[in-house]
From Swiss-Prot:
Keywords: Membrane, Transmembrane, Transmembrane helix. It is a single-pass membrane protein. It comes from Homo sapiens (Human). This is Uncharacterized protein C17orf78. Residues 148-173, 234-264 are annotated as: Disordered. The keyword Hydrolase does not apply. Its main location: membrane. Residues 148-158, 245-261 have a biased composition (Polar residues). GO terms for cellular component: membrane. It is found in: Membrane. The chain crosses the membrane at residues 187-207.
Length: 275
């Protein structure tokens, strides 16, 4: 039973772990006319996950997963968020994540944008890291479920060298709901298997006697079984077996009654007084 429980949990958690982030990087590109004149460039932003880095070369799909928002202004920049999946030879390119930039309040102070892990992506992995951006402060990562950002970008497969345009929309809300339901189902499966395993170990392996309520239920079941037999007009197997044993006694009694009338009368009186 414990083996079944372990394997069921492993199989149930496989779908949740197969899309885990292994290596993430975020690249910021400046759009013309967005920042003030004193801001000329944006440094590269790198977000490294706790997992080991892996290198993939196959570009498959484009999807928006998060919004990098900086409080205090409506300026926007273009964000290319690239992450690698655990699945073999699969790499996703995510583009057009919007940034709302906040200009510097104090020009002399050095400004930086910190990515606060406030939202979860699919399997619960948090986007972590720091963004050092001139003229921007108080930045945080927001889930793309609040808004849908349709993206269109070329995707290249190994068999086809030409770029093919694919359009994908964000489905973080559905993924979060699926995660919640999968967690509930896993808990129910684990509880059911655990209770059944404990019951089998206690009452079957160690042969612990049933409690009083269990014995009462067993008697009730036996009474219902006998009542059904009587209703059908038959007799239980136990009573049917006792009849052949009683027939020879009746034959012997009849022979004794025929040989001695007095004894037969006495026996008859005894039976009458007894009943």
């Amino acid at each position: 039973m414990d083996t079944i429980l372990v394997f069921s949990l492993i199989i149930a958690s496989y779908d949740a772990n197969k899309k885990d982030l292994r290596d993430s990087s975020c690249r910021l590109e400046q759009l013309p006319g967005i920042f003030p004149k004193d801001v000329r460039s944006i440094r590269e932003l790198q977000m490294q996950e706790t997992h080991t880095e892996t290198k993939r070369t196959t570009f498959i799909q484009n999807r928006t997963i998060a919004t990098l928002q900086c409080l205090g202004s409506d300026s926007k920049v273009k964000v290319n968020l690239v992450y690698l999946e655990r699945r073999p030879k699969v790499k996703h390119i995510l583009k057009n994540l919007r940034i709302i930039a906040a200009p510097r309040r104090n020009s002399s102070a050095s400004s930086s944008c910190h990515l606060i892990p406030t939202s979860k992506f699919q399997t619960g992995s948090l986007l972590k890291g720091k963004a050092f951006l001139p003229g921007i402060s108080q930045c945080k990562v927001l889930g793309a479920s609040s808004e849908t950002f349709p993206t269109t970008a070329p995707s290249i497969t190994p068999g086809n060298k030409e770029g093919e345009k694919t359009t994908s929309t964000d489905t973080d809300e559905n993924l979060e709901k699926r995660q919640k339901w999968s967690i509930v189902v896993k808990i129910l499966i684990a509880v059911t298997l655990l209770l059944s395993g404990v019951a089998i170990i206690v009452f079957v392996i160690f042969e612990v006697p049933c409690p009083y309520q269990c014995l009462g239920a067993r008697k009730l079941c036996q009474c219902q079984w006998l009542w059904r037999w009587q209703k059908k007009g038959g007799q239980p197997p136990g009573t049917a077996e006792s009849k052949p044993d009683s027939q020879p006694q009746k034959v012997g009694q009849d022979a004794a009654n025929s040989s001695n009338p007095k004894k037969a009368a006495e026996i008859t009186v005894i039976h009458q007084t007894y009943f």
